[in-house]
From Swiss-Prot:
Residues 61-85 are annotated as: Disordered. Residues 220-255, 410-445 form the EF-hand domain. Belongs to the MICU1 family. MICU1 subfamily. Signal peptide: none annotated. PANTHER family: CALCIUM UPTAKE PROTEIN 1, MITOCHONDRIAL (PTHR12294:SF1), EF HAND DOMAIN FAMILY A1,A2-RELATED (PTHR12294). This is Calcium uptake protein 1, mitochondrial. One of its GO terms (biological process) is regulation of cellular hyperosmotic salinity response. The modification Phosphoserine is found at S124. Residues 128-131, 261-265 are annotated as: K/R-ring. GO terms for cellular component: calcium channel complex; mitochondrial inner membrane; mitochondrial intermembrane space; mitochondrial membrane; uniplex complex. It is found in: Mitochondrion intermembrane space; Mitochondrion inner membrane. The modification Asymmetric dimethylarginine is found at R457. The gene is MICU1.
Amino acid sequence: MFRLNSLSALAELAVGSRWYHGGSQPTQIRRRLMMVAFLGASAVTASTGLLWKRALAESPPSANNIKSELGDKGKSKEEGEDCNAEKKAAGVCLEPYPEEKKKKRSGFRDRKVMEYENRIRAYSTPDKIFRYFATLKVISEHGESEVFMTPQDFVRSITPNEKQPEHLGLDQYTIKRFDGKKIAQEREKFADEGSIFYTLGECGLISFSDYIFLTTVLSTPQRNFEIAFKMFDLNGDGEVDMEEFEQVQSIIRSQTSMGMRHRDRSTTGNTLKSGLCSALTTYFFGADLKGKLTIKNFLEFQRKLQHDVLKLEFERHDPVDGRITERQFGGMLLAYSGVQSKKLTAMQKQLKKHFKEGKGLTFQEVENFFTFLKNINDVDTALSFYHMAGASLDKVTMQQVARTVAKVELSDHVCDVVFALFDCDGNGELSNKEFVSIMKQRLMRGLEKPKDMGFTRLMQAMWKCAQETAWDFALPKQ
């Protein structure tokens, strides 16, 4: 596309040059044409060079190459951090107490692999994301195979800086032969009883169709589903059948970044199946698929899904006595923030300074805060009212807004952690704009962002703008 645009630009320059030397136009118009041509060529050349360098810098190598090239560096760095046997025997290197042990830092190799995986999450197609983070391939009795995600794989696929297990990656899976009894017995390994994942058809495993649907549910506000259901509820009884639900699902999916990027790929087997094959559709409409689904039941499903995903995120931090540390909670809040690394490090240091010996947070405290975030748009409005009225946005105000808008109680300790992160100047008041913008990204888990680098869209916009500007300069309105 860029070559065609460049050739057409050069052709227009040639025409302009002949027009200029032909002397058939007034001098003023010829001067404007030459100025526009010169500025346009300079802008295209400069922008192309910068974008090309950026594309080269961000082009992801394969994960296998990263792991093989950086293996020696990672090993040498890890070996340097450990005490050798002689020092331990001499008592030079003492083992810390369990409560004093610090979390092992990510080595150079791990950081590079995580950066590559973050680019996959941000820019790749849903097909590639699924194939990279899925860990199971189940082979049926007839020899046919299908790839599945576990609930843990699903959470890892949408969470930045969560590294894929070693020896598993793109099209690399753990192979399991289909055995109905054996897989059913392993259901507890994949999902807890009572979890929404536990009710899925393949013993808590997630197929590609279910993966697309679950990401759509997580990235779509409740209000959008309410409107879509009302549009297709033709008789006004508040219920939709399977066919109407598939239309709702298709419309909602087409509005999400995942849905817009997806293309069925028969070569990999990752195609969106009809409702007849979906375990989730069976869950909604029963085994005979003749049931009805109400918006109330669907929103309850969305609430349970958000609860279960949050629970899995919480458990990934290995809670001690049912509590995670304040820094881990801060990491959950900032996971999808997009904040620059230097500022992110400064915010985490600020949190560490305030809570050197914190008591931690329970899952109930974490869940209450995320329930508060589900109403972030109303929270934004309420905080703006306080700001316009001249009231300070302190901890008491936040707790009052949570009670009024979300009907939940935020503990004093949760408010202390949030203010330690977002109280930039240390005056005990919240930085409202930054807090709301980061929390909106956290609520959507980054799933609403476009799955491309914007290079094509940028070049199209520049070309259109250059054409319009050239005509305005060359042929000014009389």
